[in-house]
């Protein structure tokens, strides 16, 4: 990737897609640009103008849904017209299409902060996530199809009498943001939710302390920092209360996992449980900024600063464990006000 030098009159234009509610992430990049004395403009896209983070961008663009066949063409047009040098996805919805079309963006001088298609495929298909983790000896909840859970006595989540061990956890194999997840306590509930959850898979229900890890992979594809944080409280699939927890075992294992996966560059988000019998069980891999990334940034893992430094040819000074342990984040809602007629 060519270095993008930021000089007076040579502004870096950075585009966030599906920006939605990511106000804190946007402002983190703004602060980083100011500290680095980088002349930067921040652009955003969304399907609706009534998007709080979109309204706080320097330039706003309404776009088609990510599933629309013209979505990528529209983004390419925005990138070309505005000389965008960096594109940052913020949700799962367009990761696959952005990854598949990276060469088209690169031809316009735009670096897309997204992993390769094979990595996206593993992360966005939870059946493949399970196979990857299992094959590489990372502990993960036993996973099976609904049919296997009900009928196959050899399944690791049913006993020798072919009776499912309840409770179980159901979720779509292609789901995101906790949508469609359900805990089932008996066979009747299993059948009920299996008919209502799209593309369901069945997993053992894991209990323990839930963690998210923000893993920073530099532009040379090397893991440079891992920040584990406890998920104290979650709302709509996104952490609302969290605490940084400098657990060396989790940090070191996260490095191995992300390197074997080949994810990056940028921030890769891992979700896992530390169980009562001291096992680390991984449940999700999201190759993008997680909703709780502002906690890690505030603790000292300044991902926006590092990204901007690398983008402009710098070499950020990154300490693997250079962040504050124990920092707690408590989130609340705020408002964005739009103009009203007199």
What are these regions (language model features)?
Residues 179-188, 194, 203-263, 267, ...:
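ATP-dependent carboxylate/phosphate-activation module, predominantly the ATP-grasp catalytic core
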Residues 119-209, 219-220, 248-252:
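Active-site nucleotide/adenylate-binding loops and adjacent lid/helix of ATP-dependent enzymes
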Residues 70-74, 115, 121-125, 180, ...:
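Short, charged, surface-exposed secondary-structure boundary motifs
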Residues 1, 156, 275, 305-342:
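Peripheral (often C-terminal) accessory segments that flank ATP-dependent C-N-forming ligase machineries
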Residues 15-16, 86-89, 142, 201-204, ...:
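Short catalytic-loop micro-motif centered on adjacent basic/acidic residues
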Residues 278-280:
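Conserved protein kinase catalytic/activation segment
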